[in-house]
Curated annotation (Swiss-Prot):
Role summary: In physiological conditions, is crucial for intracellular hydrolysis of cholesteryl esters and triglycerides that have been internalized via receptor-mediated endocytosis of lipoprotein particles. In venom, the biological contribution is unknown.
Annotated glycan sites: N34, N129, N159, N271
Record's catalysed reaction(s): a sterol ester + H2O = a sterol + a fatty acid + H(+)
Keywords recorded for this protein, A-Z: Glycoprotein, Hydrolase, Lipid degradation, Lipid metabolism, Secreted, Signal
Residues of the AB hydrolase-1 domain: 78-378
PROSITE patterns per the UniProt record, alphabetical: LIPASE_SER
GO biological process entries: lipid catabolic process
Protein name from the UniProt record: Putative lysosomal acid lipase/cholesteryl ester hydrolase
């Protein structure tokens, strides 16, 4: 009992100290900004669009049409579509400083950059028939993101830019839905010049970390804890903690370690001064059904279509008693992968399996020290990944 009291007093002292420090410093304005506002705040042009999917979800798309170095021209710039991962949003690509954010780096390198936002995250919570208060809104998983969100977003970008193809960059679940979409929808796959997979995830047989431990819980218990609608949304409590608690040096370490506990450790490669910005935008929420789908993958060791829990329901959805596997061998898009040696979610053993499944793999680089978040927030990402990606895109673009 006395230990708990002492710990509570110490924690309260840390919080009070952090709040006092925050009053002195002031809150970083980016903590309260949406994606478009962050882009403008950094001195880049910003556009925002709404895209309606085939099943009625209204997604937010953000655009950086040109950079500060590569200015607006009459000639169209090659389009790049960036797709975030699980519990994330399009801000992942722009919440670091200019040179450390892939979205800005690509814009400055001469690309027309588009940031996707999956259904159910902070910026994509509209539907033509349902509201977020209705359970019907939340009846989706990464399967629907692949089958509806990606086609709608890619087609919108191509129609808007007048181009026939674009580059696709996915991180984590963003690679999963890319793999599924481009293997199941061959006409969509033809519209992808090249697929860049960062911390790719297609099997989670050997994954570890906090999210995997959560996925190991029985389905009934997950529903009992989280309900059947939304899970881990960005909310007022998280924003308050991020803006009033994260920010002081010691507290920054604690806030940063929340991400490390979920994804792996590489603390020296995270800009701790940006943690409050990351924390006020991520997690950005998803559906409980999406987490249940990942839970099924954790327990089975493979990624299949969502298991509806009964032979009858699966027959209704798939015309077979069990959910079908995704056939990666049909994904013919030229693919380049970057993986991390310390990535708990995209484990080396799972990557070894994935490498055998991709028929048109043209490049793979493992960065031994990297974990799951280095691909979007790593301090050394420009030198160890951005440069190679941009060179590869230029080579492909100008070979056409």
């Amino acid at each position: 009992m006395w230990r708990l009291i002492i710990i509570a007093i110490l924690f309260q002292g840390l919080v009070n100290s952090a709040m006092l420090e925050r009053r002195k410093r002031g809150v970083d304005p980016e903590t309260a900004m949406n994606i478009s506002e962050i882009i403008l705040f950094r001195g880049y042009p910003s556009e925002e669009y709404e895209v309606v999917t085939g099943d009625g979800y209204i997604l937010c798309l953000n655009r950086i049409p040109y950079g500060k170095i590569s200015q607006k021209t009459k000639e169209p710039k090659p389009a790049v579509f960036l797709q975030h991962g699980l519990l994330a949003d399009g801000s992942n690509w722009v919440t670091n400083l200019d040179y450390n954010s892939l979205g800005f780096a690509l814009a400055d390198a001469g690309f027309d950059v588009w940031l996707g936002n999956s259904r159910g995250n902070t910026w994509s919570q509209k539907h033509i028939n349902y509201t977020i208060k209705q359970k019907e809104f939340w009846m989706f998983s990464f399967n629907e993101m692949a089958m509806y969100d990606i086609p709608a977003s890619v087609n919108f970008v191509l129609n808007k830019t007048g181009q026939e193809q674009l580059f696709y960059v996915g991180h984590s679940q963003g690679t999963t839905i890319g793999f599924i979409a481009f293997s199941v929808l061959p006409e969509l796959a033809k519209k992808i010049k090249m697929f860049f997979g960062l911390a790719p995830v297609m099997t989670v047989k050997f994954s570890s970390g906090g999210l995997v431990k959560l996925g190991e819980l029985p389905e009934f218990l997950l529903k009992e804890i989280f309900g059947t609608k939304q899970i881990f949304p960005q909310n007022a409590v998280i924003k308050w903690l991020a803006t009033h608690v994260c920010g002081q040096v010691l507290i920054d370490e604690l806030c940063g370690n929340f991400f490390f506990l979920l994804c792996g450790f590489n603390e020296k490669n995270l800009n701790m001064s940006r943690v409050e910005i990351y924390s006020t935008h991520c997690p950005a929420g998803t559906s409980v059904q999406n987490m249940l789908h990942w839970s099924q993958a954790v327990k089975s060791g493979e990624v299949r279509a969502f298991d509806w829990g009964s032979r009858k329901e699966n027959m209704a959805h798939y015309k077979q008693p069990t959910p079908p596997p995704y056939k990666m061998e049909r994904m013919l898009v030229p693919t380049a992968l970057w993986t991390g040696g310390h990535d708990w979610l995209s484990d080396r053993k799972d990557i070894a399996i994935l490498l055998t499944l991709i028929p048109n793999l043209i490049y793979h680089k493992e960065i031994p020290e990297w974990e799951h978040l280095d691909f979007i927030w790593g301090l050394d990402a420009p030198q160890r990944m951005f440069r190679d990606m941009i060179q590869m895109m230029h080579k492909v673009q100008y070979a056409h």
